Amino acid sequence: MAATQATAARKFPEGLRVLAVDDSPVCLMLLEALLRRCKYQPTMTRDAATALRMLRERPGDFDLVISDVHMLDMDGFKLLELIGLEMDLPVIMQSANGELETMMKGVTHGACDYLVKPVSLKDIQNIWQHVWRKRKLDIRNHNGGYNDGGELVGATRTKRKYTRKMRNDGDNYGENKENMDSTLKRQRVVWTPELHRDFVIAVHELGVDRAVPRKILRMMKVDYMTRENIASHLQKYRLYLKRISTQTGMDPDQFPEKWKYMNELDALKNYCENGRYRLTPAIASSSSSNPFARMNSASALATNGFLPTHSVQLKNSQRNMAMGTVGHGGSPGNNPVFQPLQNSSNARKCFPSGPSGSSFANISNGLVLDTDDSGSSYAGMFCKSMWETSNGSPSCHSGNSSANKSNNGVSAPANQFQVQSKFGFSALANQFPVQSNCGFSAPANQYQVQSNGGFSVPANQFPVQSNGEFLAPTNQFPVQYPEVNNQPLVQMNQSSTNHFSTIGNDYQFPDLANCSKYWQPTAPSMFPDLGHNDGTSFRPSQANIANINQLSSFAASSGQEPMFGDELHGQMSPIMSTISLSDFDDQMGSFNIGNDTSPAEMMHDNFSLGSDSNISSSTPTDSSFGSTFPDFHLDSPEMPAQMLNGGDEDGILLPVLDDTVDQQDLFDQLDENNGREKLGSGRCVRKGPFECFF
């Protein structure tokens, strides 16, 4: 028996043992003939139950099974399934139905081949390949051999038992496989702030464009990190830097180191929360068109330690805001140093109405610009950069500061800041107000003049103040008395609106862009004939510039509603009783108002020019006006009268005065007319000299 099996194995495929199952006797006889012609050993049966019993009784006596698809006692696919589960033998299906769906169904159930009736000799000759393929697979799995037939059969039985056991324990096998797969998966790398900081340091040491994952991994020295992790993070980091460069217009390689690392860590936090890089608020605010808004972060100025409630001040090493006069041989101030403000309450008093928003309003709180004279610093270069950015061109002034300093103080070039007089800080109308006599006021075209150390502004901007009284129109916001400080500070709030933001249009001072010129040539364009007759000119050294057109502060602007009657009288009487013209006598001297000068405007109701150089509510003498201003002349014989109420028909028209008309004659004429005259369509009632009302 053993010798016969060994001989059959050496002559394979001769002697192949085949079990054929078909309920049709004709097909079964034809198949048997073909099998014998190919020198196979066939076993024929007509029912599936008999074939299944034979396989169970003698599982090692057959190498191959050929079964019909459609049988009476059992479906061929059912028999195929049972044989595959119990015996693990190769099964070939045959049928007269050659449809593709039927063939695919057979292959799906485990058939190794599908034959269409009538079966040809060529098909039968090639069936041995399935048996050979099956045996090679068993040999590979169990390291069996063909030394004799017994060993081959034993290997086949062992394989069948192993396969059956695995199928019975299919559920447990699936769970074990899932556990193995989860164990083999690579763990996800979490980028902590420390890892990201090491990554940023490595990238910027190598250069953003020259950094590669291999070199970055070598510099970071992290064992569990792979080049794929570094490459993914590097790609996201480059996209983040590109967005910053697009928003700010700056090269990422030129960012300050502290600012760069701070924003990178903030962006990492946003990345961990949202799954991608996102611009921080300090960078998001840089999309503003204001050039100073791009610096709107404490990290940009290396001032991360300041609290958000600190104020921004310009502080001098000797005296706060003690600016010298421009044009007296001052030298440029150097090295602004940032220091926190010690007492911000005094600074708020300088701006009782709460100045909000200007070209510097977007600078973050927490800075004091201290102008020191020693050496150079990064802050000085930063201020110079801010100056160049705001003007669109490099600064034409030497030094590391954007201002010219004189008299131990700091002031700015003529196209940015105005002159200073007597321990004050003064600025052009396009930047800051003008100060005189330790007060804080602005040029006449934007703000009104100051008297006796007070703070006064025109009716169209801010209320008027004199000698400790602060008067505001009813249609304006309430304000408080501005306490004059010996060391005035500049408080810059974070609000977005302010009257300062509207100052400084190009049509007012067309030559401001030329930094080689003083501001004086530009001012006469607004007042063409002031000072032409007696040589009076606008110079930085004159302290009485802001006092010109003193009476214009009491004129109502066209955009506001003036107050009349008892309401104005109740608020103007303290000013009339306290304002003295003697302060202006010594400073103003003689000056002429030219042909193009705007006419003097006077408010009605109880406003009178008193005697003894005082404005009071009492009735003065007729010669008080002439004695107060002996050199005051009105040169224009055709000076137009102006309505005080914005051009209405019932407005008060001032009388036209010729330069040759005597002032005393004018008063006598008014007396002769018994105090009543018609001027245009308005009506003037005289109760005293120059007291007119409706």
Curated annotation (Swiss-Prot):
One of its GO terms (biological process) is cytokinin-activated signaling pathway. It is found in: Nucleus. GO terms for molecular function: DNA binding. CDD domains: REC_typeB_ARR-like. This is Two-component response regulator ORR25. The lineage of its organism: Eukaryota, Viridiplantae, Streptophyta, Embryophyta, Tracheophyta. Disruption phenotype: Dwarf, chlorina, lesion mimic, abnormal shoot, low tillering and low fertility phenotypes. Keywords: Activator, Cytokinin signaling pathway, DNA-binding, Nucleus, Phosphoprotein, Transcription, Transcription regulation, Two-component regulatory system. PANTHER family: TWO-COMPONENT RESPONSE REGULATOR, TWO-COMPONENT RESPONSE REGULATOR ARR10. Belongs to the ARR family. Type-B subfamily. Residues 183-242 form the HTH myb-type domain.
